[in-house]
């Protein structure tokens, strides 16, 4: 279930909700787009082209709205040989010169935003669209045994390009450990 937890920078939990409308509204206040899309009931073995075809209307709408030029599908399973390296790549606080847009087709992952003196944990699940605005500091944790498929959208054809902040704040907050 999608969850939003808000913390002070010292780690004190300030609030938590699983209500989709509340999550959308609260995140909009800091410039983050969060939406719930209907899922398509794709087979567990559906791959990139089939996934993109199933969500073509939504993807085209987002491309037109955001100017995205590069669209792909990423799938990471618990037995992926590079899962630990992939996880580490995203765990440090960073920014991007463009929005970071992800739609979770399957599974889940934890986006953590660092904005306006707060830390915002957003557990994204199947059917969640998350758009972190350009320049917002954040990190992403897929967990030690990741199991998700997501559609990614980029303006830059080179894809994911991060500028790491050098802050250790991500190390001071719990990692994503699914139940």
Give a label for each model feature:
Residues 95-115:
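Short, conserved beta-strand element in jelly-roll/cupin
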Residues 1-68:
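N-terminal leader/capping segments at the start of a protein or of a new domain
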Residues 73-97:
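Conserved short histidine dyad/triad with adjacent acidic residue
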Residues 113-116, 121-123, 142-143, 162-164:
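A short secondary-structure junction signal
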């Amino acid at each position: 279930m999608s969850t939003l937890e808000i913390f002070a920078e010292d780690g004190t939990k300030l609030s938590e909700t699983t209500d989709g409308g509340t999550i959308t509204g609260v995140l909009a206040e800091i410039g983050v787009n969060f939406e719930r899309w209907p899922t398509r009931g794709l087979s567990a073995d559906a791959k990139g082209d089939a996934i993109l075809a199933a969500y073509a209307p939504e993807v085209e709408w987002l491309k037109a709205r955001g100017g995205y030029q590069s669209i792909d599908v990423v799938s990471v399973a618990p037995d992926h040989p590079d899962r630990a390296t992939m996880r580490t790549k995203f765990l440090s606080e960073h920014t991007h010169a463009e929005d970071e847009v992800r739609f979770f087709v399957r599974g889940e992952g934890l986006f953590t935003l660092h904005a306006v003196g707060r830390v915002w944990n957003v557990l994204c699940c199947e059917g969640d669209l998350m758009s972190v605005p350009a320049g917002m500091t954040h990190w992403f944790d897929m967990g030690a045994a990741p199991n998700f498929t997501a559609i990614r959208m980029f303006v830059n054809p080179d894809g994911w390009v991060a500028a790491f902040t050098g802050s250790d704040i991500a190390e001071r907050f719990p990692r994503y450990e699914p139940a």
